[in-house]
Amino acid sequence: MNTTSNLKIGLALGSGSSRGWAHIGIIRALAEQGIRPDIVCGTSVGALVGAAHVAGNLDRLEEWVRSLTRLETASFFELNSSFTGFVNTSRLRKFLERHVAKADTRIENMAMQYGSVATDLESGREIWFTKGPMLEAVWASISLPGLFPAIRHEGRWLVDGGLVNPVPVSVCRALGADVVIGVNLNGDIVGKHLAKTPKKEKKNGVAEAFSNLVKEYAGPLFSFSEEQDEPPGLFDAIAGSVNIAQERITRSRLAGDPPEILLAPKLSHIGLLELFRAEEAIEEGRKCVQRAMPEIDFLLQKM
């Protein structure tokens, strides 16, 4: 619809880890309705999906996340020798270069405007990336403390932007957006991160043995527990803490700078690191846009 007007449409893709695959469905559904943003800004996983879209790699990213399994997800995590995080950074970099943007991709060379948000670990200030290497902008924005090592940039240690600006409406406006569509992944998550995942298919042989090994050592990463009365594991506790903090910050930021349109996919059943549940998240992203289309149509026609 922005193709028939002079409005600059901004898309603010919020933080939310595994729930962020819903951004793929949202981008697809908006495009099907003729809504193609001029400006894409993202925080954390929103920065990652947004970068893939702006760099022309959304198809490649979607194909990969739809094929991701529980065991492949677990392979991204290991305690590194310096005890700075649990993410295999070498594997993550290869993934980003293959499915998000090439190492030499620069933000200012893209056809769409792009921005990401990170947090200065020392001062607590938000840092915006609107030019320079795209992968650096993504990496800084997704560096969730405790899981990802902080990234050094211009003398600062940077971590996940969701700590300060979970839905970067302000970045879209600063880049010139007349209308901002915000995506909040944190609206219904507090207290629900322990929801069970769909039942797994039965494995046998080596696959089953390996699955059991992963379950033993990486179980707290996902919803392996059969008993909801068990005390939360390490990553359940991290997930709950992150959910509470981001929900409160999101509410505060959106109250002060609301987007013209706010999309809130229903994703409370997907845990912090359940990256293998992409199909559910993408489908809910599509449904979220479909539910909001009467409001979106009305607003854009009025403007």
Regions found by a protein language model. Name each.
Residues 1-43, 51-303:
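Patatin-like phospholipase
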